[in-house]
Amino acid sequence: MDCIAIALLALMVHSEAGTEPLDGKIAVAYVAVNRATMSGRTLQDVLTQPRQFKINLRLRVSESSAYAARVALNRLQPDPTGGADHFYAHTVVPRPGWYDE
């Protein structure tokens, strides 16, 4: 795993779930790792695909977001998503069509 992919994952976690507790951040990190694994693409390719994940380059990554990225990348604990490759914030958007799949 290259340093750019690791940094991008930590930045994505902080951008998408910066205000969530650690378990939420870990879940978001696992979603990206799962998507890369399932698609056979690199993590960097998955993270930089248009309109998939928010990555705010102006943010300073918190320790907990960086830790969550390390947990998912190194599979330091069981995947709390059960292998999910998508997530959504129910407080931000209505239930997406793929939710029940």
Predicted regions and their residues:
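Bacterial extracytoplasmic/cell-wall-associated proteins, especially those involved in peptidoglycan
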Residues: 3, 7-101
